[in-house]
């Protein structure tokens, strides 16, 4: 058997640590959901402010069928963007949320489809003036799947 030099052992150790850091970071992003934002100690207040004055269905808090969070940059602010839909009926109700950990700001878009008319109703949640155009573009892209299909296409300076 060959010997492993101390340099080789160091490389293996660094590689192992790097793999764990990457896996932990990816797992943390994958674990970020709209329902976890609604219930989280540091995010609950921002979520409640976002939905204030709106009655959302229970599945939003309990957890729907969701997509993993994606990172989007608007200006100099970085956001985690995620979406979810009503379990077993994704076509009828969907929600997309943008959250900035830096400013602890949250904004969203809720969509319902009228079964009789097939018309979609969009409800904007806590969209401030700074986010009005680009933020709405990103939220709608998350809602429709465009953000997931083109993740680098929605970063705006």
UniProtKB/Swiss-Prot annotation:
Q: What would be one Pfam family of this protein?
A: Ivy
Which Gene Ontology cellular component terms are annotated? outer membrane-bounded periplasmic space
Q: Primary place of residence? A: periplasm
Signal peptide start-end? 1-28
UniProt keyword Disulfide bond, yes or no: yes
Q: Which cysteines are joined by disulfide bonds?
A: 85-90
Site (Important for lysozyme inhibition) found at 88
Q: What does the record give under GO molecular function?
A: lysozyme inhibitor activity; protein homodimerization activity
Q: Which UniProt keywords apply?
A: Disulfide bond, Periplasm, Signal
The GO annotation for biological process reads: chaperone-mediated protein folding
Q: Where in the cell is it found?
A: Periplasm
Q: Write down the superkingdom of origin.
A: Bacteria
| SUPFAM superfamilies in UniProt | Inhibitor of vertebrate lysozyme, Ivy
Q: Which family does it belong to?
A: Belongs to the ivy family.
- What does this protein do, in the record's words? Strong inhibitor of lysozyme C.
What does the subunit comment say? Homodimer.
- This chain's protein is named Inhibitor of vertebrate lysozyme
């Amino acid at each position: 058997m060959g010997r492993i030099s101390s340099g080789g052992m160091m490389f293996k150790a660094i590689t192992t640590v790097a793999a764990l850091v990457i896996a932990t970071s990816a797992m943390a992003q994958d674990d970020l959901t709209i329902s976890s934002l609604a219930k989280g100690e540091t995010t609950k207040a921002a979520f409640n402010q976002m939905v204030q004055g709106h009655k959302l269905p229970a599945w939003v808090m309990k957890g729907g069928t969701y997509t993993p969070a994606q990172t989007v940059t608007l200006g100099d602010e970085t956001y985690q963007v995620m979406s979810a839909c009503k379990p077993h009926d994704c076509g009828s109700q969907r929600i997309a949320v943008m959250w900035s950990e830096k400013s602890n700001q949250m904004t969203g878009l809720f969509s319902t489809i009228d079964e009789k008319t097939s018309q979609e109703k969009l409800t904007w949640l806590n969209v401030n003036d700074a986010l009005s155009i680009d933020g709405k573009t990103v939220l709608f892209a998350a809602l429709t799947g465009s953000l997931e299909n083109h993740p680098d296409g929605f970063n705006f300076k």
